[in-house]
Amino acid sequence: MNHFFEQLNRDLKQSADALPQLIIDGQALEQNLQYATTKFKYATHLQPRLVVKSLASMELLKTVSAKLSTQRFMVFHLPQLLPILENFSEADVLLGKPMPVRLVQQFYTQHPQSEHGNIQWLVDTKARLLQYLEVAKVLAIQLQINIEIDVGLHRGGVDSKAQMIELLRLIEQHPDNLKFSGLMGYDAHVTKLPPVIKKVEVAYLESQATYQCYKDIIQQQFPQLWHAHLCFNGGGSPTFYLHVKQSVCNDLAFGSMLLKPSDFDSEGLRVLQACLWIATPVLKVLPYSQLPGLTILNKLPHRSKALFVYGGYWMADYVYPQGIHPHVLYGRSTNQEMVNVPKTTQIEVDDFVFLRPTQSEAIIPQFAQLTYYLDRSFKKWQSFRE
């Protein structure tokens, strides 16, 4: 990667922009998209669904959507719902978490034309479903309802057959205002559990068995709600590689793995390339670190230079120049962060240092634009700022 960062540093210094930038390596992104495309070519049991919060830029979403031939999206933040509906004529949106009922009512009151949009609202309890039912009655609309199920993550959602039957019965009783659209079971725990507690393969099979149990309830006890186009959503980037091999789901949500921030470094995703980087310019170069109140340390031998960079303290790890790291005692800063590099490092003011984000969803909203870097040229893509 050293050659990549050296070239990127030179190209950034020749560009007009000297602010901190969030860089997408276009070549690496293309490789990741090719990997996903190939997997879906053979995983004919699944349809891809893009997680908007993880790819929170309209141009990025359009690029990925076109490459994967999908207009299925998962939205976690309501202000991002309308832009998706407006920019994708065939948008199929599944909410990734239950929304407060006031937001649902506000959305349809402010955007009545969206009544005809393909939106699946996620419901986790009978109480929430009753709230949604009341809104649908007041507005004289029909809401598509997707039920959140607990497949082992234990973050809420239906966790018993009795609860599932209760929700399905309520939907069945109000066909004018509620339409059952499917299930959503997020299984991120599968790859996070220490092997000593449960192996990945075992945890995945257990989560799949739980999912199938709820599907069976629908098909066997509520046949009038069952049809071929129900959305059985699962996954997330961590378990992508498992679902494409075998899954009881027919709809797979993912996003982060395409950019591969460091939280998604795993054995199952090892073939994917990291392609999201923060580039920030060096403001000051000092021969060594000086600590306030400890001038006596200045007389000691120093093996590191001290740099002060533009910004800092992102959810990201410094990766270049080699050996770069925050100072242990000086403290972190979001304004001008001090970092150390080996004394032999050739670096000057206005050079860039590089960091690798741990998440994409936490970092993208902090930058007004994404900088798409391909063939030594840059494109600016607007990001979703909230």
Placement of each model-derived feature along the sequence:
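Conserved, mostly hydrophobic/aromatic
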Residues: 29, 53, 84, 147, ...
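Generic N-terminal amphipathic, Lys/Arg-enriched alpha-helix
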Residues: 4-24
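A non-catalytic, amphipathic alpha-helix used as a structural packing/dimerization or gating element
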Residues: 24-35, 206-213, 353
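Active-site-proximal beta-alpha core segment in soluble small-molecule metabolic enzymes
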Residues: 48-193
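C-terminal accessory subdomain/extension
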Residues: 286-386
